[in-house]
Amino acid sequence: MPRVLLVDDDATIRDTLYELLSEHYVCQTAETAEKAFARLEADEYDVVLTDISMPGLSGLELLGHVRQKFPDTPVIIVSGIGDQEHAQGLIRLGAFDFLLKPFSLDVVEKSVRRAVEFRKRQAEENRAEDDDAPGNLTEAADWKIVKS
């Protein structure tokens, strides 16, 4: 089952998202970006869903960390502050999606599903690229150079 990390300082939102998503995904929660960093270092996640405004490090800093260390992991940003321009800026910084609070649970579910599908496609593409590359010197020696 795909793994989702839910990061929000508001326990009610964390619990609501957990209830919504835990039927189809293995969900873990963190109430700060710092705790999310620790979870990301310990386990692999298919999607990170994070609030942007939290005490300590922000969801924006978490986004930067994930983009740098786990570039194939989609990050969905949730915020009570923002507009279309703000959302586009976050997407340019590498967010997979931006959801404005208060959000519809249906919209959250669809966004997470799309992110999981995106992650799955990326993993398949990476495996295909790895299969095309020579795995060792013997395999590399089997490649032929053709002069035209």
How should each PLM-predicted stretch be described?
Residues 11-28:
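Two-component/phosphorelay signaling modules centered on CheY-like receiver
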Residues 32-35, 58-61:
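Acidic catalytic/metal-coordinating carboxylates
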Residues 44-49:
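Active-site beta3 strand of CheY-like receiver
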Residues 85, 103-112:
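C-terminal output helix
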Residues 117-148:
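CheY-like receiver
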